[in-house]
Amino acid sequence: MDKLLDRFFNYVSFDTQAKANVKSVPSTQGQRKLAQALQQELLTLGFSHVTLSDHGCVMATLPANVSWPVPTIGFIAHLDTSPDFSGKNVNPQIVENYRGGDIALGIGDEVLSPVMFPVLHQLLGHTLITTDGKTLLGADDKAGIAEIITAMVRLKHRNVPHGDIRIAFTPDEEVGKGAQFFNVAEFDAQWAYTVDGGGIGELEFENFNAASVAIKIVGNNVHPGSAKGVMVNALSLATRYHQELPVDETPEYTEGYDGFYHLQSIKGTVERAEMHYIVRDFNRDSFEARKKNMVDIAKRVGKGLHRDCYIEIVIDDSYYNMREQIIKHPHIIELAQQAMLDCDITPIMKPIRGGTDGAQLSFKGLPCPNIFTGGYNYHGKHEFITLEGMEKAVAVIMRISELTAKRAKES
């Protein structure tokens, strides 16, 4: 079996599901176990400067094999899988030469259907790797890890000219902490690419501005038979609050460059209620306006309440649109575009309706757009990837590395 797939299957065997609302990084021990395994693998493969931080970030260097000065570049992927779906006991299925139609996911009624996922129509003849319907696959982002390491090994064995290349594998990307303890100075690259995208050709340097919003509503509970003028129902206030938000500006009604408000959870009693939202927008001004709107709604709904009853709102910015930083370094995008074209791939430039480690790293001084892995339908049982997509990602990583050295020689 191809070594690329061997690596991928090994990595997905580790349960690295991240946990939200955990103070420690990494948030789960499985991530640390995978990090330790990668550290040993990189040492065995002969990489230099292999390190594993206290927070589970693995770094290593593939030393230059050319005599002229070349900018140090980097490639980054993340160890963890989504907290939204189990990543324990992943059992990948290989579907060779896909001929169309439904693909049974394990034993049972679960299928991967082109009716629900029309992209399958474009993948006839490809080798698909799917789940067994019980877990996610973990292509997000263990495919990225496998692709980066495989690309580095091939660069070395085929003696393709390249400068120093830094690689890193980070924890807790899925819960927004991947870059929190990433040491940019230690990584010491002029720019990098996260390998954390989707289908073949994806090249992304725009992402949401993102914030989390926690709302606490304190009411007053008395017997409903004698409640008139006294009871303040926190749940009623919560529903009033939510109804003040625009109905069509939610994830299920938005796409492309549209922003949204998303109610993730609501719980409570008459006495007390809690709501958790996320706010997303590509435009910084619109992003700030959305946050202000949420504060204004809290003031309106809470107006006139008894002094012991109130609405408290806490807004935390998570990350910003890396476009602000990337456009200062247009050659980084142009280089990736050219590498894809050289690999017979049409670059697909589109905004990330989410975030990556690269977003935070770009604001820490490491410009870091995102390139594809070849995977689809992340964060659930319908996740899959194509072997052809993985091989293309490896080829692009290698070509970016080669082009960087080639252009440095010519300049």
UniProtKB/Swiss-Prot annotation:
Q: Where is the active site?
A: D80, E173 (proton acceptor)
Question: Which of this chain's residues are annotated to bind Zn(2+) 2?
Answer: D140, E174, H379
UniProt superkingdom? Bacteria
Matching Gene3D superfamilies, A to Z? 3.30.70.360, Zn peptidases
GO terms for cellular component = cytosol
Instruction: Name where it mostly resides.
Output: cytoplasm
Q: InterPro entries per the record?
A: ArgE/DapE_CS, Bact_exopeptidase_dim_dom, Peptidase_M20, Peptidase_M20_dimer, Peptidase_M20B
- Listed EC numbers: 3.4.11.4
Q: What binding details are noted for the cofactor?
A: Binds 2 Zn(2+) ions per subunit.
Which Pfam families does the entry link to? M20_dimer, Peptidase_M20
- Where in the chain are disulfide-linked cysteines found? none
Decide whether keyword S-adenosyl-L-methionine is in the record: no
- Reaction(s) this enzyme catalyzes, per UniProt: Release of the N-terminal residue from a tripeptide
Kindly list the cofactors needed. Zn(2+)
The molecular function terms of the Gene Ontology recorded here are:
metallopeptidase activity; tripeptide aminopeptidase activity; zinc ion binding
Q: Per UniProt, where does Zn(2+) 1 bind?
A: H78, D140, D196
Q: Where in the cell is it found?
A: Cytoplasm
* UniProt keyword terms in alphabetical order: Aminopeptidase, Cytoplasm, Hydrolase, Metal-binding, Metalloprotease, Protease, Zinc
Q: What class of enzyme is it?
A: hydrolase
Q: What does this protein do?
A: Cleaves the N-terminal amino acid of tripeptides.
**HAMAP family xrefs:** Aminopeptidase_M20
| NCBIfam families xrefs | peptidase-T (TIGR01882), PRK05469.1 (NF003976), PRK13381.1 (NF009920)
Q: What is the recorded name of this protein?
A: Peptidase T
Q: What taxonomic lineage is listed for the species of origin?
A: Bacteria, Pseudomonadati, Pseudomonadota, Gammaproteobacteria, Enterobacterales
